[in-house]
């Protein structure tokens, strides 16, 4: 299944290793080469439809998590390759697809040269651990955004720096900061130059973010091609300061005693595949135990978990 780990679906055996690699005791380390024996291969194929309404748009394929690597073909043509078990791989497949039925094929290996960089204390599985999605976006869209909130030295007022990167067809970008009730706190419209632009908001006495008062704002980013809005992206924003002064951890100027835990992206049934319900259960149990800080293992966890 997708998502699903091979070893939990009848293909191969799960391996737990603290220090070392999954082939420890059977094969010698020879980076960047990995053993051929027991390096299982998974092949995936399925058809999908591209609606006519997607004509003229950029079409992206996103694979949320593929262990240990993934080769991608669409309609018999090679699209690309990625290796990083805990980061999403995104491919622009616009020129590979056609309206109507299309064929996608993936090939994955249990181990790759990237496996040498993923030697951490956890269960070793292979497969697709997160969702696979197709997205159609207007030619005028947001490429990247960097948001930097900073409190002043008195932990009272704040600035919010927003830096955007866009495709060439974008003529303007509208920025709107809203409070928890949806009210407009600040807004600005900028014209990117060379696909880049930025602005710094001055925010007077914002509600602060902390573990006890998780106040969040929402930044709306509306992209326009000069004829109308082509894309709107929202991002939660929290205003806080984290620092160490005189060997004391301070959040918004106040001392905090960390009661933390390490959270691996690991499910007793799904392995690396962790459902939203299980994530919420984890959070509920941690709150019951008065845990106020979480280390999200050695890897990037799925985005929806901290959200």
Feature annotation, model-predicted:
Residues 1-22, 103-111, 180:
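Accessory carbohydrate-binding/adhesion or oligomerization-edge regions at the termini
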Residues 34-143, 167-169, 293-301, 305:
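Accessory beta-strand-rich segments of carbohydrate-active enzymes
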Residues 54-57, 97-101, 203-216:
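Short glycine/proline/serine/threonine-rich loop/turn segments at secondary-structure transition edges
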Residues 72-74, 157-191, 197-199:
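Beta-strand-rich binding/interaction modules
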Residues 87-89, 194-203:
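Aromatic sugar-binding surface patches on proteins
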Residues 105-107, 218-222:
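Extracellular recognition modules
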Residues 139-168:
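Surface beta-strand/loop "capping" patches
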Residues 146, 220-288:
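N-terminal carbohydrate-binding accessory modules
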């Amino acid at each position: 299944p997708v998502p699903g780990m091979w070893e939990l679906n009848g293909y191969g055996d799960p391996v737990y290793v603290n220090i070392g690699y999954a082939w420890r005791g059977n094969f010698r380390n020879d980076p960047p080469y990995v053993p051929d024996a027991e390096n299982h291969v998974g092949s995936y194929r399925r058809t999908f439809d591209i609606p006519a309404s997607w004509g003229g748009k950029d079409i992206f394929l996103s694979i949320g998590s593929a262990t240990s690597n993934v080769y991608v073909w669409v309609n018999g043509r090679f699209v690309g390759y990625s290796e990083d078990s805990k980061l999403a791989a995104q491919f622009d497949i616009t020129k590979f697809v056609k309206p109507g039925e299309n064929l996608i094929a993936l090939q994955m290996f249990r181990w790759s040269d990237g496996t040498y960089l993923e030697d951490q204390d956890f269960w070793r599985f292979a497969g697709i651990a997160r969702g696979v999605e197709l997205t159609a976006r207007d030619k005028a869209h947001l490429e990247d955004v960097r948001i930097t909130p900073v409190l002043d030295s008195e932990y009272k007022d704040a600035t919010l720096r927003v830096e955007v990167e866009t495709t060439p067809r974008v003529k303007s970008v509208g920025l709107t900061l809203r409070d928890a009730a949806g009210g407009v706190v600040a807004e600005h419209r900028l014209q990117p130059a060379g696909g880049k632009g930025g602005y710094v908001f001055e925010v007077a006495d914002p509600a602060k973010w902390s573990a006890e008062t998780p106040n969040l704002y929402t930044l709306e980013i509306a992209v326009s091609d000069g004829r109308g809005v082509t894309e709107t992206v929202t991002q939660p924003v929290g205003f806080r300061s984290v620092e160490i002064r005189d060997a004391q951890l301070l959040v918004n100027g106040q001392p905090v005693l960390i009661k933390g835990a390490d959270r691996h992206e690991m499910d007793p049934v799904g392995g690396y595949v962790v459902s939203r319900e299980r994530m919420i259960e984890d959070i509920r149990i941690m709150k019951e135990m008065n845990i106020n800080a979480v280390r999200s293992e050695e890897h990037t966890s799925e985005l929806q978990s901290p959200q």
